[in-house]
Amino acid sequence: MKHTELRAAVLDALEKHDTGATFFDGRPAVFDEADFPAVAVYLTGAEYTGEELDSDTWQAELHIEVFLPAQVPDSELDAWMESRIYPVMSDIPALSDLITSMVASGYDYRRDDDAGLWSSADLTYVITYEM
């Protein structure tokens, strides 16, 4: 399925840079403290666009989420994202072969409200692709 290829292209590009992170194909349900720093690449909201007749065009939100221990400030999440993730996202040749467009759509902070184990920064893009 194309979704696997999309995630793999981003993960491969990120893994080529020495980030020191544990990478996840999909958003993990649980973390071990040894996993930090962690980066998850996943898709949400994938749906058929129906824009063109006889076309199988889809759109989804691509997430690149950085996870660090809960006690780190947002500024540390920002520094991690700005120095290790954002520069890679601007040049992924394997991804450009799979998509028709990619537009930055958001940046959000999250906290583990259940166990208090992690904090995260989630960089999102809206991507369009042919299935």
From Swiss-Prot:
Keywords: Host cytoplasm, Late protein, Viral genome ejection through host cell envelope, Viral long flexible tail ejection system, Viral penetration into host cytoplasm, Viral release from host cell, Viral tail assembly, Viral tail protein, Virion, Virus entry into host cell. Coiled coil: none annotated. It is found in: Virion; Host cytoplasm. Plays an essential role in tail assembly by capping the rapidly polymerizing tail once it has reached its requisite length and serving as the interaction surface for the completion protein. GO terms for biological process: symbiont genome ejection through host cell envelope, long flexible tail mechanism; viral tail assembly. Homohexamer. May bind to major tail protein V, and /or tape measure protein. This is Tail tube terminator protein. It comes from the Viruses. It holds the Pfam family Phage_tail_U. GO terms for cellular component: host cell cytoplasm; virus tail. InterPro entries: GpU-like_sf (IPR038512), Phage_lambda_GpU-like (IPR009312), Phage_tail_protein-like_sf (IPR035934). Belongs to the lambda-like tail terminator protein family. Gene3D superfamilies: Phage minor tail protein U.
